[in-house]
């Protein structure tokens, strides 16, 4: 499956999360959704990156911030969250003129560490995997943040709601 876009949603009132999850599950463009903890509350994998999808998401009740990332290049896609190990969505701001070099360096990381990797209008999107939160932190701090051209990395831990 080719990904059309990734979307990251932040709600001012977390009471709006359950209605938002129900609403996004009805979207025909939705491939997968994840509850996350960090800068956002929900991460979505979408089959379409068009303006109509973005506009539909913008109408969700209580939505305060939307990072909508249409995919221009997908180097790695598709993964399934399991109860073990730990996963985090990474959204990265990258200098446009250094994007190719950054993406090549990220693609050189083992697939076991970066399960998803895509570039788009919002920079780069990835899913990091590790045995612990600390292992993912070390990966980001030692191998991703220092890359020339990476301006900012935001980390959002994937929450397995079946474990709550």
What residue ranges belong to the model's regions?
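A compositional/biophysical signature of low hydrophobicity enriched in polar/charged and small residues
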Residues: 1-164
């Amino acid at each position: 499956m080719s990904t059309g876009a990734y979307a990251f949603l932040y709600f001012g009132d977390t009471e709006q999360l359950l209605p938002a999850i129900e609403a996004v599950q009805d979207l025909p463009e939705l491939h997968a959704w994840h509850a996350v903890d960090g800068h956002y509350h929900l991460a979505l994998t979408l089959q379409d990156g068009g303006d109509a999808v973005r506009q539909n998401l913008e109408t969700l009740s209580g939505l305060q911030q939307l990072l909508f990332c249409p995919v221009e290049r997908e180097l790695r896609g598709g993964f399934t969250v399991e109860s073990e190990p730990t996963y985090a969505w990474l959204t990265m701001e990258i200098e446009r003129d250094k994007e190719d070099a950054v993406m090549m360096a990220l693609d050189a990381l083992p697939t076991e560490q970066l399960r998803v990797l895509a570039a788009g209008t919002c920079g780069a999107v990835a899913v990091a995997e590790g045995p612990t939160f600390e292992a993912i932190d070390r990966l980001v701090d030692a191998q991703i943040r220092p890359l020339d051209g990476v301006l900012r990395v935001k980390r959002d831990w994937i929450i397995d709601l079946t474990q709550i």
